[in-house]
Amino acid sequence: MAQKQIKVTLVRSVIGTKQSHRDTIRGLGLRRINSSRVLVDTPEVRGMIHKVGYLVSVSEA
């Protein structure tokens, strides 16, 4: 059975955000605005997305 995947896209700049939020964005594999990654939908990834939800958009991959 294939694991569910989600697409995460950075839609706002990380300038002026907390260092921990910038680290979380890097942990998700995002570098610049409009960069996207397809990630496995796990509780760990969901927690990271919840932390920086105001910077990213999420859709099903």
UniProtKB/Swiss-Prot annotation:
Q: Please describe the quaternary structure of this protein.
A: Part of the 50S ribosomal subunit.
Keywords of the record = Ribonucleoprotein, Ribosomal protein
Q: Fetch the Gene3D superfamilies from UniProt.
A: Ribosomal protein L30, ferredoxin-like fold domain
According to the UniProt record, one GO cellular component term is:
cytosolic large ribosomal subunit
Q: Which family does it belong to?
A: Belongs to the universal ribosomal protein uL30 family.
Q: What is this protein called?
A: Large ribosomal subunit protein uL30
Q: Which GO terms describe its biological process?
A: translation
Q: Which InterPro entries match?
A: Ribo_uL30_ferredoxin-like_sf, Ribosomal_uL30_bac-type, Ribosomal_uL30_CS, Ribosomal_uL30_ferredoxin-like
Q: What sections of the sequence does the record tag as coiled-coil?
A: none
* A family per Pfam: Ribosomal_L30
> GO: which molecular function terms?
structural constituent of ribosome
Q: Is-annotated flag, keyword Ribosomal protein?
A: yes
